[in-house]
Design a protein with these regions (language model features):
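N-terminal leader/auxiliary helical segments
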Residues: 1-261
Length: 261
């Protein structure tokens, strides 16, 4: 959604494929997203958060420790666009059903930059991946802060019943969002993931995570309606989502003018 709104994040990111992968990085090695992680990394490490009922990731610490050292690459390099699920389907269909496309022009070739493993381009992708990870942590901080405030305002406190209702509401809200971009496990992305400074992510883990992303996007084209929320409200979701997007763009805009390329 940040890339689609043409704000500061969209202007800053060069490798959109890496940025989108970064958006899920905190949930990969903790074991939430990818099954059968041999040695899961504790949540307090992957999410920069204390072990509490409604944890609030310290996104600013992650920025200082991992994004700032890479900012010398900001704005450098050729753009790598994200792949939509529709384009992926068309590429696959052209392989399996070539007769359907007889007489039609070929799809544009994939730019060589998308699979490049040149050190400077991998470093650019690493910045975008790391920025995506920060965006995840910032979003979690804002969402959980607002959930905590919502609960406190109604005299409630965290409990197992609260957790179940909250998770159910978030699951349904997620299904209402129209998401069409998927991540490609390119050599460039794998190289950037293995160089992720907080903890390396192996090629196998990248492949597994991108597979999950593809399934999620395929199964959730964006629903027009949903069952009634059990804890939160439509207003809560719309207002907090807007805050997440606006805050992320605002913070990134503060470094846009300092790019070196």
């Amino acid at each position: 959604m940040l890339l689609a709104r043409d704000g500061a994040v969209a202007a800053f990111v060069r490798d959109r494929n890496a940025f989108l992968f970064g958006n899920v990085v905190p949930d990969v090695l903790v074991g939430y997203m990818v099954p059968d992680i041999a040695d899961p990394i504790p949540y307090r490490i992957t999410h920069f958060a204390e072990s509490e009922p409604i944890p609030k990731p310290r996104a600013w610490e992650f920025w200082d420790g991992y994004v700032t050292p890479l900012l010398h690459r900001a704005g450098c390099g050729a753009r790598v666009e994200a792949l939509t699920i529709a384009r992926e389907r068309e590429r696959i269909n052209r392989v399996h059903y070539p007769h359907r496309y007889e007489g039609m022009p070929d799809l544009p070739p994939i730019p060589s930059a998308e699979s490049s493993t040149r050190p400077d381009e991998v470093e650019q992708s690493l910045l975008d991946l790391t920025l995506g990870t920060w965006a995840h942590l910032l979003a979690d901080n804002i969402w959980n802060t607002r959930v905590n405030e919502y609960l406190t305002a109604r005299g409630g406190k965290p409990s197992e019943e609260f957790r179940i209702k909250k998770q159910g509401d978030f699951d349904w809200f997620g299904k209402t969002l129209h998401v069409e971009s998927v991540v490609r496990a390119t050599p460039r992305l794998k190289a950037a993931a293995s160089a992720f400074a907080q903890y390396p992510i192996s090629s196998d883990e990248v492949l597994k995570a991108t597979g999950v992303i593809h399934e999620v996007v395929r199964e959730n084209p964006g629903r027009a309606d949903h069952p009634p929320y059990r804890l939160l409200t439509e207003a809560f979701f719309s207002e907090t989502l807007a805050e997440v997007l606006d805050t992320t763009d605002r913070l990134v805009s503060e470094v846009l003018d300092k790019t070196n390329c």
